């Protein structure tokens, strides 16, 4: 009996997290189909899990980045620039894919929804201004409000300052980083219970009946995201590593994308991505900075959402869009997507900004936003899964490419 209990505990604490998450997913679907009331009650597990991830993510980013920079050795490469380049290429490519799909399969919206009582940003300048204000945020406010741009700036600043500290100070910061990482691993082990609660409560609250009216729009949105995740991203990774990208792509989708799909929060998925980078044996100096940065600016899914819904509104109103305008929309959508994390409501509230390019009034644009909220159960989940899994994917591609370069240099030196 004790042996069976120890085996069960070992499976819970050390077993495959992906298998456990799939079990939680299946259990959530079964519970929602059997008892709506019980499924709603189980939602507390999901709320607690997402809350725990959001609670630990800001302090994790602060301590990890600070420790990484404080203990950084002179001359050691961090590879942030090539990672940023891939982030921008990936986001712009996603916007282009969304334009092509919207032209090939134009969607029409029933624009009769009530305009939401929310205020979108008035222009791209306001979005950029919001990002700049995030940079100079009070560090306590940045931690409390999960302002990752502000947290990164303070972490980098403190890390540089601590590089001039004593060895014992650096050691203490490193120990703090290890302690927070250990807490994160404990939280992540509760992912199956969290996913179980999230799936059960979501299905009990909304079901999928409300989504059928927007089936065509959802097919274009989800199709675009699948195309980016399974075709465009692998091509970018292949260009970087010059070998089969799919083992890496599928692992990132499985271990990062699945969790992100159900938490629907790039910030909450930061600890999951950090743990996956550690498992992939990537350079900590690179991923400790690039993961929180990716959660802020690497927004391929958001670029697709903004582009598809904006073009759907234009098509509904009979507005003709030429190729140069479509390309300009791709650029604007990419810039908007990079600022999505700094706007309450994310990518949906940046749709009016893109709609203004075509002279679409704010009232109609806000009705498009309302449609976005209706389909958000799937749209937001898929968007977050693409955004978050791409962060790890591109970091891994850059790290593998750099490792290959170093190996080639060593080989040539030996000849």
Curated annotation (Swiss-Prot):
HAMAP family linked: Ser_Thr_transp_SstT (MF_01582)
Keywords from the named record: Amino-acid transport, Cell inner membrane, Cell membrane, Membrane, Symport, Transmembrane, Transmembrane helix, Transport
GO cellular component labels: plasma membrane
Statement: the UniProt record of this protein carries the keyword Cell membrane: yes
Gene Ontology terms describing biological process: serine transport; threonine transport
Listed GO MF terms: neutral L-amino acid:sodium symporter activity
The keyword Metal-binding is assigned to this record: no
Superkingdom assignment: Bacteria
Purpose of the protein: Involved in the import of serine and threonine into the cell, with the concomitant import of sodium (symport system).
NCBIfam families for the chain: PRK13628.1 (NF010151)
Principal localisation: membrane
Gene designation: sstT
Membrane topology (UniProt): Multi-pass membrane protein
Annotated localization: Cell inner membrane
Chain segments annotated as transmembrane: 21-41, 45-65, 85-105, 142-162, 193-213, 217-237, 289-309, 331-351
Organism whose genome encodes this protein: Pectobacterium atrosepticum (strain SCRI 1043 / ATCC BAA-672)
Catalyzed reactions per annotation: L-serine(in) + Na(+)(in) = L-serine(out) + Na(+)(out); L-threonine(in) + Na(+)(in) = L-threonine(out) + Na(+)(out)
Name of protein: Serine/threonine transporter SstT
Family: Belongs to the dicarboxylate/amino acid:cation symporter (DAACS) (TC 2.A.23) family.
């Amino acid at each position: 009996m004790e042996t069976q209990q120890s085996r069960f505990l070992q499976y819970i604490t050390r077993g495959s997290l992906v298998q456990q998450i799939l079990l939680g997913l299946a259990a959530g679907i079964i519970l929602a189909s059997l008892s709506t009331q019980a499924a709603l009650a189980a939602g507390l597990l999901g709320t607690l899990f997402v809350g725990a991830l959001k609670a630990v993510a800001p302090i994790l980013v602060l301590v990890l980045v600070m420790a990484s920079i404080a203990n950084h050795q002179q001359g050691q490469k961090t590879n942030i620039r090539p990672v940023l380049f891939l982030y921008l290429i990936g986001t712009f490519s996603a916007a282009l894919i969304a334009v092509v799909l919207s032209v090939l399969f134009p969607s029409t919206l029933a624009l009769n929804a009530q305009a939401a009582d929310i205020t979108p940003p008035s222009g791209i300048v306001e979005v950029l201004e919001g990002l700049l204000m995030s940079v100079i945020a009070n560090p306590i406010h940045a931690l409390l409000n999960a302002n990752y741009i502000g947290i990164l700036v303070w972490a980098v600043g403190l890390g540089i300052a601590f590089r001039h500290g004593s060895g014992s100070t650096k050691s203490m910061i490193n120990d703090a980083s290890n302690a927070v990482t250990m807490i994160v691993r404990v939280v992540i082990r509760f992912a199956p219970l969290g996913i179980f609660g999230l799936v059960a409560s979501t299905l009990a609250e909304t079901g999928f009946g409300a989504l059928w009216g927007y089936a065509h729009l959802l097919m274009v949105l989800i199709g675009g995201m699948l195309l980016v995740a399974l075709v465009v991203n692998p091509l970018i990774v292949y260009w970087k590593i010059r070998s089969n990208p799919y083992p890496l792509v599928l692992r990132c989708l499985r271990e990062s994308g699945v969790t992100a799909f159900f938490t629907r929060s790039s910030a909450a998925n930061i600890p999951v991505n950090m743990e996956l980078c550690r498992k992939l044996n990537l350079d900590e100096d690179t991923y400790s900075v690039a993961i929180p940065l990716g959660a802020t600016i690497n927004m391929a899914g958001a670029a697709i959402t903004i582009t598809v819904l904006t073009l759907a509104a234009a098509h509904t109103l009979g507005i003709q869009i030429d190729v140069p305008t479509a390309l300009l929309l791709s650029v604007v959508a990419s810039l908007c997507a990079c600022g999505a994390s700094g706007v309450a409501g994310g990518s949906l509230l940046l749709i009016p900004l893109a709609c203004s390019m075509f002279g679409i009034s704010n009232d109609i644009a806000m009705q498009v936003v309302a449609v976005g909220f209706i389909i958000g159960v799937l749209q937001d989940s898929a968007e977050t899964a693409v955004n978050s899994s791409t962060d790890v994917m591109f970091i891994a591609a850059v790290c593998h490419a750099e490792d290959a370069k170093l190996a080639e240099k060593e080989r040539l030196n030996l000849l």
